[in-house]
Each structure stands twice: as structure tokens, then as C-alpha cells.
Regions:
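N-terminal cap/lid segment of alpha/beta-hydrolase-fold proteins
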Residues: 55-56, 60, 97-149
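Short beta-strand element of the alpha/beta-hydrolase
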Residues: 148-159
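Alpha/beta-hydrolase active-site loop
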Residues: 166, 173, 195-220
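Hydrolase active-site cap/lid region
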Residues: 236-291, 308
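Short beta-strand/loop motif that positions the catalytic acidic residue
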Residues: 306-307, 312-314, 318
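Conserved alpha/beta-hydrolase "acid-adjacent" motif
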Residues: 319-325
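Catalytic histidine neighborhood in serine/cysteine hydrolases
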Residues: 331-348
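Catalytic histidine-centered segment of alpha/beta-hydrolase-like enzymes
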Residues: 344-357, 375-377
Length: 382
């Protein structure tokens, strides 16, 4: 197991960067704190009986039992299923390198499938052909009896340590805003049959965008939203996919994050996630470093081709993606973007997740559906 950083450091990083988002999505802070105190975290002995993966797997199972009770209302069952999906995802992160983590991901997918009937919107699995493989996506659609035209559509993707099921909480906000949403795994994560490769090599995202455009959704009303490495792909696709009308980039690496100096400083958690996504031995991050240097968006795409609205978000104290990468999009790429920087916050601004996430979704709705799509007087530059 990767252990070049102390266990205490890794657990503190987890508490700082992940706990605020998990709590906002329904996790109990007390249980998270107890898990940190009792386990070695997701990197150290996670499969032992009282290890991280095993503990959260049991929590998810308990919630599933409660969610299946016919005595509960539909809203109660939906909430319990969502929290089970959350806990199974926590058990799995940041990669499926152990048997219990792989089991946790299997249960997360099963929980998501079982919960579809109780969600207040339609969700179905989509298989998008690409070569001899399929892109697996979760397609969300609002239930709007009076809707005459198909809704706006958003392609949603996460980073190296999350799955499309983990992105359910953002997807549910998107669909509640009246938009359709296709959530897919970043290559190298979840059910993706591809490994992480630079733009120009990977055709996964352009294919998913064309699929959305071809479903009958207005090709002039398609957006893309990504968190972490998913933000990287939002920017790359904005420069290369003419179907997109707006993109949101939250915490995406752009250029300086791919420097040798920055990559060498990455915590073990992210080393494991990136190595796994690229198909390398998780214990040998040096191979990944040698390749990641070629991912800079200043080298792989022409950012000057971006002509759609861009919203970039991050915390100023991000230890994973230097805050300079948020500004370099405009300074070096010449992109006119809105910038939401949260002072003192970390990677993807987790302490302000409850603020930026719904606002960013509303921003997207207004950009691809019209300024009055979701009236929000507070949608102003921070």
C-alpha cells in the first residue's frame, strides 16, 4: 500500500477535503469522525473487519435494509437509498484496488438501480456505443407532464476518485432544475472500459456529447459540468466539441498541476486514484508522473477556441490543483470566464459545496436555457 505520507496526514486531508461534501450530501458527521478514529482510512488496511471499506460497507447495508421497508414513505425511502449510495461510495474510494472496495462498488451500483423507482425523477442506464465497447451512463430526466420540448441536457463527470454514482447528488440537482443529465465515469474509473488518456487520444467525452445531441435534445442547449479531473475534461471539450453551449469547471487541473514539482507533492490518496485510472500499479506512481506531464491543456488543446460561457470554481488553498490553474485559463488561454474563488478553501472548495454547487447548476440552466430559466439574483461573480 502507498505509504509515503503518514496515516495522520492522509486522514486529515480526507477530513478537510471530503467530509464537508459528504455531510452536505447526507452523511452523519459523527459517524465520519468515528470512522477516522477507529480505522486507518481508505489507504491503510481498508479490508480488515474494522477497516475503512468494511465499516462503511456495513453502514450502507444497514441503510438498504431500512430503505426496503414498505412502511416508509417514498421520500423517506429515496433519502435512505441516497445515503446508502453515498456510504458505499465512501467505502470504495479512492479506487477499487481491494476485494472489499470492489464489493462496495458493486453494492453501490445495485443500490442505485434499486432506488430508481422511488426517485422523484426518471433515471435509466444508457449504453453508448464507442468502437467495440460501450460508455455506461446514468441518464436523468425530469418528470414534467406539461413539457412540450425536450429539456436542456448536461453531461456530468467526476474526477479520478469518484464514480458516476457518486455524482448522483449533483445530477439530482440538475434534474430538479428541469434539465436532463447524463452522468458518466471518467476513463479509468467506475464501469469505464477505457483508461485515462489525454485529449485527442480519448474519444469518450466527445462521443457522449454527440450522443446527447443526437437524442433529440436541442444541440444548442447542451452543457458540461465536471469536478476535479472532470473539470479538466469540461475545458478540453469546450475547446473541441461545438455542440456545447456552456461548461462548468470545478477544481480542474490545467497546466501547473501537471508540473513535475506539483505531481511529486500529491498525497498518497490522489496518487492511488490517478495510478489506478491510468492502469498502472498503484504502488508505482513514478510511471504515472512520467505521462501526466503531457496532459497540460496548454499543450493538448487550443484553449483559444473556447467561445462558450465558462464558469471556473476552486478554493484558493487547493493543495492538489494550484489556484493559478484557475486563472491561467484566462491569462494564457485567452478564455473569458467567470471565476468563483473561495478564500481559504481547499480542492474543489468543499467547505462551500453547499453554496457553489446549486448556484453552479442554476448558472448552467441560465446559460443553456436562457437567463430567466432559473431566476437567481445572487448569481454574481464572487
Amino acid at each position: 500500500m502507498i505509504a509515503d505520507r503518514s496515516k495522520d496526514y492522509e486522514l486529515q486531508l480526507l477530513a478537510t477535503e471530503k467530509f464537508p461534501v459528504w455531510e452536505a450530501n447526507g452523511a452523519e458527521g459523527r459517524l465520519l469522525e468515528e470512522a477516522v478514529a477507529r480505522t486507518g482510512g481508505p489507504l491503510f488496511w481498508p479490508d480488515e473487519r474494522n477497516g475503512w471499506a468494511s465499516v462503511f460497507l456495513r453502514m450502507g447495508d444497514q441503510l438498504m435494509d431500512r430503505a426496503r421497508s414498505p412502511a416508509r414513505s417514498g421520500d423517506e425511502r429515496a433519502s435512505l437509498y441516497e445515503t446508502a449510495i453515498l456510504y458505499f461510495g465512501i467505502a470504495r474510494l479512492p479506487a477499487t484496488e481491494t476485494p472489499v472496495k470492489r464489493e462496495a462498488y458493486g453494492r453501490q451500483k445495485a443500490a442505485f438501480s434499486e432506488a430508481r423507482d422511488v426517485f422523484p425523477f426518471d433515471v435509466r442506464q444508457e449504453l453508448i456505443p464507442l468502437g467495440d465497447k460501450d460508455i455506461v451512463g446514468n441518464y436523468y430526466e425530469p418528470r414534467q407532464e406539461k413539457e412540450i420540448t425536450r429539456p436542456e441536457a448536461v453531461l456530468l463527470t467526476g474526477g479520478a476518485d469518484v464514480t458516476k454514482e457518486d455524482m448522483h447528488f449533483i445530477a439530482s440537482r440538475i434534474v430538479r432544475d428541469g434539465m436532463a443529465c447524463l452522468a458518466i465515469d471518467m476513463p479509468g474509473t467506475g464501469e469505464s472500459e477505457w483508461k485515462l488518456q489525454p485529449p485527442g487520444v480519448s474519444a469518450v467525452y466527445p462521443r457522449a456529447i454527440k450522443y446527447l445531441a443526437g437524442r433529440g435534445d436541442d444541440p444548442n442547449r447542451i452543457g458540461m459540468m465536471g469536478t476535479g479531473f472532470g473539470g479538466y475534461w469540461s475545458l478540453a471539450c469546450a475547446a473541441t466539441c461545438p455542440e456545447l453551449s456552456a461548461v462548468v469547471n470545478c477544481g480542474g487541473p490545467v497546466h501547473r498541476a501537471f508540473s513535475h514539482e506539483s505531481l511529486k507533492k500529491l498525497p498518497a490518496y490522489y496518487r492511488l486514484a490517478l495510478s489506478s485510472a491510468m492502469g498502472h500499479d498503484p504502488a508505482d506512481f513514478e510511471k504515472a508522473i512520467g505521462l501526466l506531464g503531457d496532459y497540460s491543456l496548454l499543450r493538448t488543446v487550443d484553449l483559444r477556441r473556447i467561445a462558450v460561457p465558462v464558469l471556473s470554481i476552486n478554493g484558493t488553498d487547493d493543495p492538489i490543483v494550484p489556484i493559478e490553474d484557475l486563472f491561467i485559463v484566462a491569462e494564457e488561454g485567452g478564455v473569458r470566464q467567470e471565476e468563483w474563488e473561495f478564500r481559504g478553501d481547499s480542492h474543489c472548495a468543499p467547505r462551500h459545496y453547499g453554496e457553489w454547487m446549486p448556484r453552479a447548476v442554476d448558472w448552467m440552466a441560465n446559460k443553456i436555457g436562457g437567463q430567466e430559466r432559473v431566476p437567481r439574483p445572487d448569481l454574481a461573480k464572487l
